[in-house]
Amino acid sequence: MAGAEGFQYRAVYPFRRERPEDLELLPGDLLVVSRVALQALGVADGGERCPHNVGWMPGFNERTRQRGDFPGTYVEFLGPVALARPGPRPRGPRPLPARPLDGPSESGHTLASLAEQFSPPESAPPILVKLIEAIEQAELDSEFYSRPELPAPRTDWSLSDLEQWDRTTLYDAVKGFLLALPAAVVTPEAASEAYRAMREVTGPVGLVLEPPTLPLHQALTLRFLLQHLGRVARRAPSPATAVHALASAFGPLLLRAPPPGGEGDGSEPAPDFPVLLLERLVQEHVDEQDTAPPALPPKPSKVKPAPTALANGGSTPSLQDAEWYWGDISREEVNERLRDTPDGTFLVRDASSKIQGEYTLTLRKGGNNKLIKVFHRDGHYGFSEPLTFCSVVELISHYRHESLAQYNAKLDTRLLYPVSKYQQDQVVKEDSVEAVGAQLKVYHQQYQDKSREYDQLYEEYTRTSQELQMKRTAIEAFNETILIFEEQGQTQEKCSKEYLERFRREGNEKEMQRILLNSERLKSRIAEIHESRTKLEQDLRAQASDNREIDKRMNSLKPDLMQLRKIRDQYLVWLTQKGARQRKINEWLGIKNETEDQYSLMEDEDALPHHEERTWYVGKINRTQAEEMLSAKRDGTFLIRESSQRGCYACSVVVDGDTKHCVIYRTATGFGFAEPYNLYGSLKELVLHYQHASLVQHNDALTVTLAHPVRAPGPGPPPAAR
């Protein structure tokens, strides 16, 4: 440091002013710090070369001509300069901001801070609100959010052509918005509190991420986004799977760095803590939306008195006998039962609170499921105080004739169409195995035809979506090119006037013609680019319209596909319960029966190695370890392991030489791969069934049975590997 009056540094990262005394930085800014200032900070000779070790440094920004403080972690040392600057003003200690992780960000790709984008009573940034409103007006689909690739940085956030965006662009824009924020929504300090709450508290973690732990604007934005993700998960066929996928996609975006560790017990957050935290938060919102419906307004004073006979309990039908009472079923099954049903369709189930006497009425209204809690106290039931009905049956019977609008103006319907638990068995109308099998063949063929049509539409939709994105990128490139050419034209026009006047005085007609010709060429080129951009914009609008039509056709096919699959599954369950052989079922489904393996030749089924759990259950291993165990094994070799989803298991099986993984759900009715097949009392029962039953009924790509336990003696690698 001796001999130098000052030192020069160059900004590597952009920095926004946090305090009045701070300097704004842009990459490339040159900053000068005096030797006296560094000495006042206690920096030894040579320490100036390591600004990241100095901390906050007082200096002079040569671009803005301003003095102030800047973080040493955001700059690099250039060398000494022969400049003398005034010494530093006294200041207290201050923590450094976190250094950006991924290098310099491009100017224009960063949005303003959340505090600058909106103010209460607004609930979220207007850009985010518009994007999510557009998504929810279309159709919620967690698969679009779950794509692993990150969107390209966006420079235009005006959303002027939002109505032309396809679903992929909309979903990517939400991710892009979070990436473009200058700071993560969840601060490291708030994440640290959430980590502590997840380890020590059994209640909701979301309560921790409220002001003052999380700044107000971040807390409002987080709450708004979680409510949206909760709705996305609830609409998914498997909400639990959707919650995990959404958490994997959004966790790293909302919490860009893990919280500081160093708890008293020495524990530190796992690398996947952002995913675990968001999974917990989204699940809390899903549970809140489902299991805690708001109480209805107070009941009007004019209430019909309960009939005397019912009040005495003499003629009240049993709740268990009511066709609309489904007992303890999951919300996923309720959503499935009420899917695509008319307004007024309803059923009653046990409340998720598991408190005896409490139930939940699910009513279809406006194309959505409305949840109404049935309260119980002192032998009386109702939707709100006063509780005047002597049984749930009486309550439901009353509102099959009276509108619920007296409680809530939006519920202007009666309980019109009960979803009957008895009708579920009447879907199969044939009375013989052969007749049911023949009808199964018809339904399966219809399902395959619809599936092929949907797959073709999906491929077309994906292709056109990619083309639309390419055209949008091309239009942005045209805009940049036009801007460059117009600036060049303005510069040329300004210079041309001077040269034309000069050559006119000199009488140089040739040079004057050359300048005028160049000017005309430039104008012509700009006109051509404008014309090309206009044509591309017209093509974009037409293709966007076609893309929306494809999307509509796909959405119109979904109910048919789900209904056909539901009917086909019910026929399969009926045949399985009646003891139909899997070989015969495969013939009806058009599945080729493979050559008998060594286990199918066993006359005594009790001799199967599948009866020994140790031959196929491997406990807690991950996907990679499972794939290593099944490497070079023949088709049908399998194992069962613990799943990364809490309370579930996973089956890993070799299909066409590749290892596939599928979740085994554990529900109140038993184990299974999907509803309504969750029927097996144990994993062993499930394995024994699928030893001869193909998994293709659950996934068209799984044309295999659980033939060979991975640890069973017997068949080795496939013939090609020997």
UniProtKB/Swiss-Prot annotation:
InterPro entries: PI3K_P85_iSH2, PI3K_p85beta_SH3, PI3kinase_P85_cSH2, PI3kinase_P85_nSH2, Rho_GTPase_activation_prot, RhoGAP_dom, SH2, SH2_dom_sf. Phosphorylated in response to signaling from activated receptor-type protein kinases. Dephosphorylated by PTPRJ. Dephosphorylated at Tyr-649 by PTPN13. Phosphorylation of Tyr-649 impairs while its dephosphorylation promotes interaction with FBXL2 and SCF(FBXL2)-mediated polyubiquitination. Residues 87-98 have a biased composition (Pro residues). Residues 83-109, 287-319 are annotated as: Disordered. Residues 112-289 form the Rho-GAP domain. The keyword Ubl conjugation applies. The modification Phosphotyrosine is found at Y458, Y599, Y649. GO terms for molecular function: 1-phosphatidylinositol-3-kinase regulator activity; phosphatidylinositol 3-kinase regulatory subunit binding; phosphotyrosine residue binding; protein heterodimerization activity; protein phosphatase binding; receptor tyrosine kinase binding. GO terms for biological process: cellular response to insulin stimulus; insulin receptor signaling pathway; intracellular glucose homeostasis; negative regulation of cell migration involved in sprouting angiogenesis; negative regulation of MAPK cascade; phosphatidylinositol 3-kinase/protein kinase B signal transduction; positive regulation of cell adhesion; positive regulation of protein import into nucleus. Transmembrane segments: none annotated. It comes from the Eukaryota. One of its GO terms (cellular component) is nucleus. Residues 324-419, 616-710 form the SH2 domain. Keywords: GTPase activation, Phosphoprotein, Protein transport, Repeat, SH2 domain, SH3 domain, Stress response, Transport, Ubl conjugation. Residues 4-80 form the SH3 domain. The record marks R147 as: Arginine finger. The SH2 2 domain is required for interaction with FBXL2 and PTPN13. Heterodimer of a regulatory subunit PIK3R2 and a p110 catalytic subunit (PIK3CA, PIK3CB or PIK3CD). Interacts with AXL. Interacts with FLT1 (tyrosine-phosphorylated) and FLT4 (tyrosine-phosphorylated). Interacts with NYAP1, NYAP2 and MYO16. Interacts with FBXL2; PIK3R2 is a substrate of the SCF(FBXL2) complex. Interacts with PTPN13; dephosphorylates PIK3R2. Interacts with XBP1; the interaction is direct and induces translocation of XBP1 into the nucleus in a ER stress- and/or insulin-dependent but PI3K-independent manner. Belongs to the PI3K p85 subunit family. Regulatory subunit of phosphoinositide-3-kinase (PI3K), a kinase that phosphorylates PtdIns(4,5)P2 (Phosphatidylinositol 4,5-bisphosphate) to generate phosphatidylinositol 3,4,5-trisphosphate (PIP3). PIP3 plays a key role by recruiting PH domain-containing proteins to the membrane, including AKT1 and PDPK1, activating signaling cascades involved in cell growth, survival, proliferation, motility and morphology. This is Phosphatidylinositol 3-kinase regulatory subunit beta.
